[in-house]
Amino acid sequence: MLKAVLEPAIGSKSKRDLKDYLPTLRNINKLERWALLLADEDFSKETQKLKYELKSGNSLENILERAFTLSREAARRRLKERPYDVQIIAGLALHEGKIIEMKTGEGKTLSSVQAAYLNSLTGDGVIIVTVNDYLAERDSNWMKPVFDLLGVTVGVVLSNMDYERRKDQYAKDITYVTNNELGFDYLRDNMRYDLNEKCLRKFNYCIIDEIDSILIDEARTPLIISGPTEGNTNAYLEVNSLVSFLKECSKDSKSGDYPLEIDDLDGDYTIDEKAKRISFTAKGLNNLEQLLVSKGIISGSLYTDSNFNYVHYMTQALKAHLLFFKNREYIVGDSGVEIVDEFTGRVLTGRRYSDGLHQAIEAKEEVRVANENKTMATITFQNLFRMFDKISGMTGTADTEAKEFHKIYNLDVVVVPTNRLLARIDEEDTIYYTEEFKFHAITDEVYKTYKKGQPVLVGTASIEKSEILSAMFKNRGIKHEVLNAKNHSREAFIIAEAGAKHAVTIATNMAGRGTDIKLGGNIEHRVRKKIGTNVSLEEFQEAVKNERENYLKDYNEVKSLGGLYVIGSERHESRRIDNQLRGRSGRQGDPGRSRFYVSLEDDLMRLFAGDSLRSLMGKLGMATGEPITHSLLTKSLINAQKRVEDRNFEIRKHLLEYDDVITKQRDFIYAQRNSILEDTAIKDRILIALEEYLSFLLEGTKGGSVSSVFLNEINLIFAYMLESLGSIENINSLDLKAKLMQIARANLDEKENLIGRDLFNGFLRYEYLKNIDFKFQEHLANLDSLREAVYLRSYANKNPITEYKEEGFLIFSELIKDIKVSTIRRVLQLKLDSNSSDFKSVKKSKNVNSIHKELSGILINENKNVSNVQVVRSSPKIGRNEPCYCGSGKKYKNCHGKS
C-alpha cells in the first residue's frame, strides 16, 4: 500500500511531499492494533489523557500518532469507513498548515477529521469553513458521531441563528461555519456595545473546504456590513432612457482597438470589457450635459456639485446595458434582479451590486429600484483568514494556483494521489471558428453518445448558453435535463440521475464543484423514489440492500460504456473551473472521458487569445466550418488561461495592498473599541484626551497669548461653560489650559454625582463607541473616494498605492482626532438637572445588512436584517415628550428622537 501511495503522484515535488509523511504513516498503521482493542468508552478517556499531556507541556507533534490512530478507529466504528492511507497523509498535511488537493470522491471531509481532532485538544477551538449552510450542517451531522465517540464537542453556525446560539456553537471544540457567516460574525462582534454579546473567541486553527473558491475566487469580494441610506433612485430611471443617445467610440477596423491618442477618440465613451469599465470622453461629457439639460433633468453646468452625480448615474446605466446581461451575470426573478455567481452558477440570494450598479440594472429591467446602502464595516477574506494562528485547506483543484497560495498566504500545496489510479481519458480540445458550428458539433456528439447509452454531462458558462443548447437537443430528440440557477430546486434529482444510462445533463458551473455523480445513478435516490420518504431508517436500509443487485448491474453496464462523458462547451478563464468540470468524471478509479469544444467567438478567445489562435488556425489550413484538434492549439488555449490567471492574480494582489491599509486602520479602531468596552474609568480617558488636544492646540505659544484658532476650538468644545472665565483673550495660554481642564473635570464630576458612577461610565462608553462607529463609517466612504481619485493619478505617472497609503494615513490621523474631539464636545455640553436623575442613553437598534463587494467597484449586498448588531442601551429609555438629553431645550421626539 505504501508503495502504491507514491506511484500515482505527479511530479517530483509531490513525491517528496508524500515521502516525508511515510514514516509517520507507518507508525499510525502500527498503532492500529492498540486502537482496535479499545472499548467505546475508552476513547473519551484517551482524549482526556492527551489533553492532560498537552497541559503538562507536551507538544501536538508528540501526541499526533496516537490522536490520528484514535480518530481513524472512531471513524471506522461510527461511519463504517476506515480512512485510507492517502486520507491519513491528507490529514497530516492539514495539521501542518498546508493545502491538500484531492480529486472528486476521494473523501476530503473524512480527511479533515484527524487534523481537526488533534488541534481541538489544545482547547483553543477549531473552525471548519465550508461554502454554504447546507454543507456546514451536513458535514457537522455526518462527523458528529465520530467526534462524540472521541469525547470532543462539535457545533455548527447557520445563517438563521441568533447571537446566543452562535456564541454557544463557537464555544464548541470544533465548529462548522460558512466563510460568509464567520466574516460577518467578526465584523458584528466589533460593532457590539457589550463585551458579553461577542460570539467569537480568539482565532486559533481553521480548515477551509474548497479553499480555492474562498481565498481566490471570492478574494475580490470583501465582506461588508451595510446600512440603508437615502439616495436619488429616480435618477437611475431618468438616465436609463438616455443610453441610446450616447455612442461608443469608433475602433480601428483592423486591430479592433481604440486610437491611442485621446484627441483621436470619436465618440462619447470607451468600453473595457476585461475590467468592466466605462470611461467618458470630453466630447461624451459635453453631449451628456446637453442631453440632461434638454430633457429637463438638470439646469446649468454638469460640473456643479448638485449635477455632477449624473456622470456616475450615467456610467452605471451604460455598464448595466453594455457589460451586464440577463441570464448571464444575473436573472430576473420574483424578488427582482438576482446575481448569478460566475464561479458556481448559483443565485446569490439577497445580494446586490454596489455603487448604484444594481439600481441601474433594476431600471434597465423595469423592476422596482431600491435604495443604495452605506458601508458600516468591511473586511476581505484574505485578511480575515490571515488572523488565524494556523490555516489549512482542501480542494480538488489547487495546484494551478500554488504560486498565489504561497505568495499571499504562505501556504504550500500538497497533491494527494487518488486511492485508485485515474482512468479518465482527457482528449484534446476541438476548435471551431464560430459558436454556431461549435454548438452543432456538440449536439452531434451528444446525439451519438446518447444513442449508445453512455451518460453525458455538458458544462456551459451561462444560463443563456445552457438554454440555447437545450433547444438544439430538443430539436434532435435528445431527452435531457437542464441544471442552472433558474431551476436549482431540482438539483438533487438531476445530479442523482446524471450518471444513469442514457442520461444527458446540461449544467452551468453548478455541477462543477461539490457534486458527486455516480455511475448507474444514485442508489439512495432510486430507493427514495420507490418507497417514498415516510419510512423508518430500518425500512430504508433494507430497501437499499434489496436494490443493490439491480444498481450494481446498472453500474457495470454504464462502466462498460465508458463511464461519464464530460463535454465542456467553452473554456473558462480559470483552468481550475475546467478541471472541476472534468473532475465530475472518473471518480474513484471509474472510467470516464472529457473534451472541450471551443470557438473563436467564446469570451476567453475573443478577449485574450483570438488573434494568435486565428493566425495559428490559418497556418494549419483550417476552413471556416471545419473543426481542428491539435496539441499546439490546446497549448495556446492553456497559455491564454494562464495569462488571464496571472492578470487576476495581479488584481487580487493589488486589492490586498489597498486592503492592508484599511486593515491596519481597522485593527487600531477595533482595538480602541475593545479597550473602551473594558474600561471602567472612561471619564479619565476623556480628560486625558482633552488635555492632549489642548496641548496640541497650544503648541508654539510658549506660554504667551492664544491664537484665534484656539479660541474658536475651545468655544466649540466648552460653549456656555466659558462664561465663568469672562474675557479669555489675554489669559496666559498655560493658565488657560489649566483652567479649562478644571472646568471640564468639574463638569464631568457633577454629572457623575448626579446619575451615579456606573451609569455615567456606561453613558460615556456609549457616546464614545457611537462616535467611533459613525466616524469610521464616514472614513470608509472617504477611503472609497480616495481610491477612485488615486486610480486617476496613474495617468500622471504617480503610484496609486503610494498615494493611497500616504493620504489614507493623513485622513486616518484626522479621524482619530475627530473622534476624540466630538466625544469630548458631546459629553461636556450635555446638560443634566435634578429632574433627569434616572437619565440613561437610548439603546438604538441598527438596521444593517451583510454585503459582498467585487473588485471592479461592484458591491454585492446580502439583504438580510442582522438584528443582533445593535447599540446597547445602558440606561432607561427617554420618554418622547421629555427634554432631549443633548441640552437643546427641545422635546426628545422633536430633536434626537426624530430618527
From Swiss-Prot:
<dbReference type="InterPro" id="IPR036670">
    <property type="entry name" value="SecA_X-link_sf"/>
</dbReference>
<dbReference type="Pfam" id="PF21090">
    <property type="entry name" value="P-loop_SecA"/>
</dbReference>
<feature type="binding site">
    <location>
        <position position="884"/>
    </location>
    <ligand>
        <name>Zn(2+)</name>
    </ligand>
</feature>
<dbReference type="Pfam" id="PF01043">
    <property type="entry name" value="SecA_PP_bind"/>
</dbReference>
<dbReference type="InterPro" id="IPR001650">
    <property type="entry name" value="Helicase_C-like"/>
</dbReference>
<dbReference type="InterPro" id="IPR014001">
    <property type="entry name" value="Helicase_ATP-bd"/>
</dbReference>
<dbReference type="Pfam" id="PF02810">
    <property type="entry name" value="SEC-C"/>
</dbReference>
<dbReference type="InterPro" id="IPR011116">
    <property type="entry name" value="SecA_Wing/Scaffold"/>
</dbReference>
<dbReference type="InterPro" id="IPR011115">
    <property type="entry name" value="SecA_DEAD"/>
</dbReference>
<comment type="function">
    <text>Part of the Sec protein translocase complex. Interacts with the SecYEG preprotein conducting channel. Has a central role in coupling the hydrolysis of ATP to the transfer of proteins into and across the cell membrane, serving as an ATP-driven molecular motor driving the stepwise translocation of polypeptide chains across the membrane.</text>
</comment>
<dbReference type="GO" id="GO:0017038">
    <property type="term" value="P:protein import"/>
</dbReference>
<comment type="similarity">
    <text>Belongs to the SecA family.</text>
</comment>
<dbReference type="GO" id="GO:0046872">
    <property type="term" value="F:metal ion binding"/>
</dbReference>
<dbReference type="GO" id="GO:0008564">
    <property type="term" value="F:protein-exporting ATPase activity"/>
</dbReference>
<keyword id="KW-1003">Cell membrane</keyword>
<keyword id="KW-0472">Membrane</keyword>
<feature type="binding site">
    <location>
        <position position="896"/>
    </location>
    <ligand>
        <name>Zn(2+)</name>
    </ligand>
</feature>
<dbReference type="InterPro" id="IPR036266">
    <property type="entry name" value="SecA_Wing/Scaffold_sf"/>
</dbReference>
<dbReference type="InterPro" id="IPR044722">
    <property type="entry name" value="SecA_SF2_C"/>
</dbReference>
<comment type="subunit">
    <text>Monomer and homodimer. Part of the essential Sec protein translocation apparatus which comprises SecA, SecYEG and auxiliary proteins SecDF. Other proteins may also be involved.</text>
</comment>
<keyword id="KW-0813">Transport</keyword>
<dbReference type="Pfam" id="PF07517">
    <property type="entry name" value="SecA_DEAD"/>
</dbReference>
<dbReference type="GO" id="GO:0005829">
    <property type="term" value="C:cytosol"/>
</dbReference>
<dbReference type="GO" id="GO:0065002">
    <property type="term" value="P:intracellular protein transmembrane transport"/>
</dbReference>
<dbReference type="GO" id="GO:0043952">
    <property type="term" value="P:protein transport by the Sec complex"/>
</dbReference>
<dbReference type="InterPro" id="IPR004027">
    <property type="entry name" value="SEC_C_motif"/>
</dbReference>
<dbReference type="InterPro" id="IPR000185">
    <property type="entry name" value="SecA"/>
</dbReference>
<keyword id="KW-1278">Translocase</keyword>
<keyword id="KW-0811">Translocation</keyword>
<dbReference type="InterPro" id="IPR027417">
    <property type="entry name" value="P-loop_NTPase"/>
</dbReference>
<keyword id="KW-0067">ATP-binding</keyword>
<dbReference type="Pfam" id="PF07516">
    <property type="entry name" value="SecA_SW"/>
</dbReference>
<dbReference type="InterPro" id="IPR014018">
    <property type="entry name" value="SecA_motor_DEAD"/>
</dbReference>
<dbReference type="InterPro" id="IPR020937">
    <property type="entry name" value="SecA_CS"/>
</dbReference>
<keyword id="KW-0997">Cell inner membrane</keyword>
<feature type="binding site">
    <location>
        <position position="87"/>
    </location>
    <ligand>
        <name>ATP</name>
    </ligand>
</feature>
<dbReference type="GO" id="GO:0005886">
    <property type="term" value="C:plasma membrane"/>
</dbReference>
<dbReference type="InterPro" id="IPR011130">
    <property type="entry name" value="SecA_preprotein_X-link_dom"/>
</dbReference>
<keyword id="KW-0479">Metal-binding</keyword>
<dbReference type="GO" id="GO:0031522">
    <property type="term" value="C:cell envelope Sec protein transport complex"/>
</dbReference>
<protein>
    <recommendedName>
        <fullName>Protein translocase subunit SecA</fullName>
        <ecNumber>7.4.2.8</ecNumber>
    </recommendedName>
</protein>
<feature type="binding site">
    <location>
        <position position="516"/>
    </location>
    <ligand>
        <name>ATP</name>
    </ligand>
</feature>
